[in-house]
Amino acid sequence: MDILRVLSRGIKPNPKSKAQAGGATTQLPSAGALPRPQLFHDPVGSRGKKRKRRRGAQDDEPEGDDQELSDVDYFAPKKAAPEAAPTDVEESPKKRKIKLLDEDECRQILRSHRLKLTILSDQPQAEAKTEAEEPASKKKSSKKKKKETEGKDKKDKKDEHKKQIFPQPLTSFGELRHTYDVSPQLAANIAAQGFRVPTEVQMASLPLLLQPTTALKKSEGADIPNIDNGADFLAVAPTGSGKTITFLIPAIDGVLRRRAEEGRDTDQHVLEAVVVAPTRELATQIVNEGRKLAIGTGVRVVLMKRALKLDVEEVADEKSKDLEEGSGSEQGSGDEESEGEEESEGEEGKTSKEAKPLARVDILVTTPKILLNFLSGKAGARRLLPSVRSLILDEADVLLDPLFRKQTMAICRACTHPNVALTCWSATMASNVEALVTKHLLQARQEDRQPTPALHDELKYDIPLEAGGSARVAVLHSSMADSARSKIMARFRAGEVWVLVTTDVLARGVDFAGVNGVVNYDVPTSAAAYVHRAGRTGRAGREGGVAVTFYTKDDIPFVKSVANVIAASEKQAGVQADGGGGGTVQKWLLDALPKVAKEDKRKLKVRGVESRRTGGKATITTKSSWERRREHNRAQAVEASKRRKRQRREEGPAAGEAEGEWGGLED
């Protein structure tokens, strides 16, 4: 017997509410695949083109339209004209390679999709040098004139420093085979995965990463550095825009090209690309996507494990302490494993610790710490990766954060090939992008991992047994074993787990296409953290997801960054809050929220909210609200009893003295 049906027997269903509920469910992110992978396609007018029509052209256009309309004849047997076009394309594929767009056409396409590509150079050092060599007579000028000249010079230098380029855009994945000479098997795998129209990041990145000389062939007037051996690349794109596929396709294509140039067989594997991800879940996802693209190519995409042995070059180095600082507490275990392997080589009886053969790897996907433990080697020595030609940092802003920065820099130093190319990918980047890439400096963001299991214990009893009970709630944190984390990820993707409690770092980049809602139990420490959290519901431009943020009185000063991000995204989507278009952030709310200084924002990133860091009332408890209320009432009753006893002790002697002074009734 269904108790809900019995209780609602006398209630008549409302057909309007059913229709609204049905319409709402179809708009959820889990409703299906997005038919439109591109987020932007703004109309951009042609540059330098006359808008006034000529007399001859004005008369010619209708004739062309009439000719196009006259071709639609259902009784005409002639079909030679439409059949001639595909035959010409098939007979002369070389013409499609040479056919490139002009710089003006590239500019229009890139701007219509809101794409901007710039060259990052060493201009700041030149600026410092010129400022130091200024003559003393120039510094004695008036303050007003000095400010004007300095502002103009800085603006000119800034424009020269941020030189914008317009490479060839990728309009369809079919161009990879003909224009950029991608392997036929790789092109077939891309088509088998259903990729037809590229997203914005794929449109701008793939031509530069596959063949930069071809992509920049039509660029004029740009001081382009030497890119014959590849180029370092930094990409900032929204979550769910296909960044994983964008850096995997050039990595696999580069392995195939170098294998063909060197004449190696498919059985000969050389480690040529390393993909670094901050979490194991994201690394596992990258491996799965890479193996789909590498079917039939002979390229092996492998996930780094502790027992994996790579072909490295071991050199003596007295400065191996840099590796020890980045490896952390688990470095000792890696050293013990390496020492155990060396001892096992001399012992014939112990078969479990025998030296393992070299792993056959072309593309290695890893997290920073496990690779660094392998590279640490013995004391006084370090291991290098001289064959690596491509180093890829996924979620680069986290890997260059002080939380992972030492480990990431140590891995970069281990890749000693002179032509190694570094590519960084993320959905958010700091404002000082150049300093982030060159010096690997970013403010630390340390997080408390204790609230994650505590919140899981708090929520696991809220789902009734009829719906699955505590099995519908799962927790994911770095203290768990790798096998347990993989099982939870598989259960969540299969729909067995409804609520997943996790942290910022573990949720970054992992593709959860069917997530309909995100609950921020704690206010994000920055706008970038909110973008990554809310991006779970908007993968590849899906609409209908809900992101709910809880905040307390202590969080009010830091809510404005989140509100600004929401307001900017709604403005970009054409949603107006005051006009009744469904906006969630009102103007009065933005004006009422206090402004936060940069120093306070820095402290928030480094130390978090002060009230939660100190503990006490802000900590998450596993007790129910009824138990907390009962304990609170009991504590208040005990406090009231103690207060009454103190009052009696204070009032007792005074009352006795007053009674002793009374002399009775007078006669």
UniProtKB/Swiss-Prot annotation:
Q: Where is the composition biased (Low complexity)?
A: 77-86
What this protein catalyses is:
ATP + H2O = ADP + phosphate + H(+)
| Name of the protein | ATP-dependent RNA helicase ROK1
Keyword Disulfide bond on entry: no
Q: Which GO terms describe its cellular component?
A: nucleolus
Q: Where does ATP bind?
A: 237-244
Query: What molecular functions are annotated in GO for this chain?
Result: ATP binding; ATP hydrolysis activity; RNA binding; RNA helicase activity
| Oligomeric form and interacting partners | Interacts with the U3 snoRNA and is associated with the 90S and 40S pre-ribosomes.
Q: What is known of its domains?
A: The Q motif is unique to and characteristic of the DEAD box family of RNA helicases and controls ATP binding and hydrolysis.
- Give residue spans, biased composition: Acidic residues: 59-71, 333-346, 658-667
Region spans: Disordered:
1-99, 121-170, 318-355, 608-667
Species annotation: Chaetomium globosum (strain ATCC 6205 / CBS 148.51 / DSM 1962 / NBRC 6347 / NRRL 1970) (Soil fungus)
Entry's localization field: Nucleus, Nucleolus
Domain spans labelled Helicase ATP-binding: 224-447
Q: What does this protein do?
A: ATP-dependent RNA helicase involved in 40S ribosomal subunit biogenesis. Required for the processing and cleavage of 35S pre-rRNA at sites A0, A1, and A2, leading to mature 18S rRNA.
Keywords linked to the UniProt accession: ATP-binding, Helicase, Hydrolase, Nucleotide-binding, Nucleus, Ribosome biogenesis, RNA-binding, rRNA processing
- Where is it mostly found? nucleus
